Amino acid sequence: MAKTALKVKAARKPKFGVRAYTRCQRCGRPHSVYRKFGLCRICLREMAHAGQLPGVTKSSW
């Protein structure tokens, strides 16, 4: 889990645009965040399996 200070820091608009980065809205993880959902891969998988993301289904082929 991310510290509260890091979540607040990421929410602020940086002085330079290239310093902006995404964090998971649920757990605060800074890596592998899907922009479309605003969630990291781990939270996305958990919520999809629980059926909390409408329209998201497990793919199979």
UniProtKB/Swiss-Prot annotation:
Q: Which cofactor does it need?
A: Zn(2+)
> Which GO CC terms are listed, alphabetically?
cytoplasm; small ribosomal subunit
Listed binding positions for Zn(2+) are 24, 27, 40, 43
The record describes how the cofactor is bound as: Binds 1 zinc ion per subunit.
Note one Pfam family from the annotation: Ribosomal_S14
Q: Which Gene3D superfamilies match?
A: 30s Ribosomal Protein S14, Chain N
Q: Which GO terms describe its biological process?
A: translation
Question: What's the subunit arrangement here?
Answer: Part of the 30S ribosomal subunit. Contacts proteins S3 and S10.
Protein name according to UniProt: Small ribosomal subunit protein uS14B
According to its UniProt entry, this protein's organism is Cutibacterium acnes (strain DSM 16379 / KPA171202)
Q: What is the lineage of its organism?
A: Bacteria, Bacillati, Actinomycetota, Actinomycetes, Propionibacteriales
Write the gene name: rpsZ
